Each structure stands twice: as C-alpha cells, then as structure tokens.
C-alpha cells in the first residue's frame, strides 16, 4: 500500500506538471495553477498520447513523459506558481489508496480494457483492429492515456492509479468549498455530488459500492462520470463568475468527458447553452479542441472505419474495411 501511495503521488505531480506547462503555453505567461487546472493536465496528456500513437508505440515515450511532468512540477514549485492545498491532496490520496488497496481489478478491465491498453502501448494505431474484436474499436481517450502511462515504478503500474488520481483531484476541489461561508451554486453542487458518492458507497451492500469498487481499475465508467460532474460544476462556476479561464476549462472538460465515453455526448449541451446566451470561446481554445477532435475522429476511422464507433451513421465506406 505504501508503494502504491508513492506512485500515486508521482502521477499526481505528472498531471500537475503538464497542467502548469499547458497553461504556460496557452496563456503565454507562467500564471498560478489551481487544483481545478488538473483538467489542463489530463487534456494535454490525452492530446499527447493520441498524437504520438499515430507514429510510434507509446511504450517508447512513457518514461520520458513521466520525467518531463515531474521536472516541470518541481520547476513550478520553485517558482511558487501553485495555489493548491497539498495537505488535503495527500490526505485524499491516502484515503483512496486505503479503500482500494485490496479490491482487485473489475471484470471488464480483465476482459478487454487491459488488452486494449497493451495494444496501444506496444503498437502504433492498428488499422481495422475493431474488426478483430468490437471492444478494441471503442475509441476511449482514457485508455489511450493509460497506454501512455503503462509503466511500473516500485512494482506498481500507473494504469491502476489513473482513476484514483482523478478522484483525488475531484475531492480536493470539493474540499476547497467546505470553508466558504456563503456557498454559491457551484459549491453546493460539488459538495452534494461528494455526499451522494460517499453515501451510495457507504450504504451499498457490496463492499465499497459499484462506484468506489472501480477504483484501481483502468475502466472508463467512473472516469467519465467524474468528468461529467466536473463539467457541470465548471458550467455553474462560469454562470456564477464569468471568468474566461473557467469557460476554457469547461470546454476542455466536455471534450474529456465525451472522448472518454461517447454515451456522455449529452454534455455538449452546456457549451451550446453558453453560446446561445452570447458567450463565445476564443479562437485559440476553439483551434485546440478542433485539433484534438480531429485526432480522435481519425483514430476512430483507422481502427474501425467509423468516426465515432459504434454509431453506424458515422461509418465511412473504404476498400480496407
């Protein structure tokens, strides 16, 4: 359990390192990184893993990606550009490692998630892999990211800590709102979401409940759920305080949600509502999301012949399919 905790801390620093680096590139200045900016970190890792897998097996770059994330995290620490409660972040890390330590891997992860991750790790994108097994054609960016971090430290593979890291950031963000006296809608929504997850897990008859039982598995169900909830939170946050940075985070989080699990496509209604209300995303974020979507669609087409598998209307006839 101790080694799992140490490796989780390593992955958290990698995500925060990429979050700081992404913000530096995007905003052209080294502004402070907050807990909610983990969205930037995951987005940049999604984008990087997708882009690299077009050309090389991801196992060739896993170590270098981890090292870069850690180094940029340390650089940002030295520059004092983090505005994050690291004490609560560490405490939540310990909590989730403790409750998930002996749960084992879920059935779906054993059946096909691990195989999908290993294929992306060992090979470039494989033409028509969805024809071999439909599950391999499910184009989840989360699994592509897991393929990028398919590497062991201290006998612990990072892929088993991915969703634990996400839950840690999520709960840490909620803890920031507990001390606020006059709680706004975003605070209330986030706190109630945490209360529901914990209550459901506490009263569920089977171990930690079907939500927290997924911790430690490279699955997409709880991951997409957290991204979905966080998208709604960012939506309320922007409504409450029309800050452009929150608007950018919302669009990135919506992309993370949909590209992790396509069944959450309904979340795109949130940015549409904002556009109808007269709010517009800037050109830079539009180009970034468009490029990320382009890579995701092309990857899906190469793997299955469909832009969005298994939606048949998105399939394109070709001589190779």
Write out the residue ranges for each language-model feature.
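Transmembrane helix irregularities
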Residues: 55, 102, 152, 218-219, ...
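Aromatic- and kink-enriched transmembrane "portal" helix at the membrane-lumen/periplasm boundary
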Residues: 184-226, 234
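Membrane-embedded, hydrophobic transmembrane alpha-helices
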Residues: 1-80
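Membrane-lumen/periplasm interface segments of specific transmembrane helices
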Residues: 101-104, 145, 284-321
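Active-site lumenal/periplasmic loops and adjacent helix-entry segments of GT-C-fold
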Residues: 97-192, 213-217
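Membrane-interface alpha helices of multi-pass inner-membrane proteins
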Residues: 48-53, 246-262, 267-273, 291-294, ...
